[in-house]
Curated annotation (Swiss-Prot):
Binding site for (2R)-2-phosphoglycerate: 162, 336, 365-366, 387
Cofactor requirements of the protein: Mg(2+)
Catalytic activity, EC: 4.2.1.11
Protein name: Enolase
Amino acid sequence: MVYIDNIAAQEVLDSRGNPTVKATVILSDGTVASAIVPSGASTGKREALELRDGDDRFGGKGVLKACENVEVAIADELVGLSPYNQAEIDAIMKELDGTNNYSKLGANAVLGVSMAVARAAAKSLHMPLYRYLGGANGVIVPTPMLNIINGGAHADNDVDLQEYMIMPTGFDSFKEALRASAEIYHTLKKLLAEDGHPTALGDEGGFAPNFKNNEEPIEYILKAIEKAGYKPADEVNIALDAASSEFYKDGKYELKGDNKVLSAEELAEFYADLVAKYPIVSLEDGMAEDDWEGWKILTEKLGDKIQLVGDDLFVTNKTILAEGIEKGIANAILIKPNQIGSVSETMQTVRLAQRNGYNCVMSHRSGESEDAFIADFAVALNTAQIKTGAPARGERTAKYNRLLEIERDLLYPEYIGKELF
């Protein structure tokens, strides 16, 4: 019987130069597999807790305590167990932690081990990760949301909305869709440069210049789509991540880029005007995570027109999602494994969403690494959508390149962008 022989952890750097956990699992058959945990910038209040050292190293952001928890507390419980029972492994770590948000061991410690165990098990069985986790059902190569203009907490500019994304929905393959997206990205860079805008990049590889308001980035993206030779709405649509918790103050929404302070009703109307004017098919975190009344207003106004994605709202938590489903809040959920803390819990949330007709969008974090786990995970769970940044910066393209490999390797890959909306 193959069993877990050893578990190790190392402090490594993410794409923002901050420390994160790399966990390595060694099996008795000699299989070695590792996983690197991502980290977010705009985080929901109810996310699972990253354990940081809080000392002088790395401005308090070191993760040596989390690494120690992997090598001592977690390893003591898991060494000797079969790696092929993911649910059991994750349940043991959850019980060992004993809190509802992994504040004892750290979600960065637990998730690192959870991912590494899954990868080791797949490798030991000579299976690709997506096939190991998804079985024969994992056939949909997800339609990407590519964040090509960054604002909010992801950039040092005066744009309030955090992400302006393109969705290449009108193509027959992921390969074609990614090519179109890259061409649009490069065209956008030229357009910005021609107008005297700096083309510095934000955390997720998108451009981050200043604009006169929150609508101007959409105009630039539409120009780039057309100039690159593609058709807005027919081939390429627009998705937004407002990350509105970041500009929610005292029950109001402060849009500094537009010099406006809006109520939830007024903000919903602001979005409705954008949706009527532009080919916007998806809006993430349109209201603040604590403003459930605002979410109800937004869902009633736009829920039958576009995809309304809860990120900070649901934090990949099945209990919170169940409450949202019961109250008719949003119609889609962003899936970030490090928000909930383990592979198994992520899968449970996805299954709940899919059973109730909520779309799922697999997602990276702004602090990423070369680890492409979520690419396989998206295919395994048939999320049909993935959000992993611009077609630039190695930690972003690692996911896209892995999806290209998966599409090539699948016997009958499905790219269903045309059917999403």
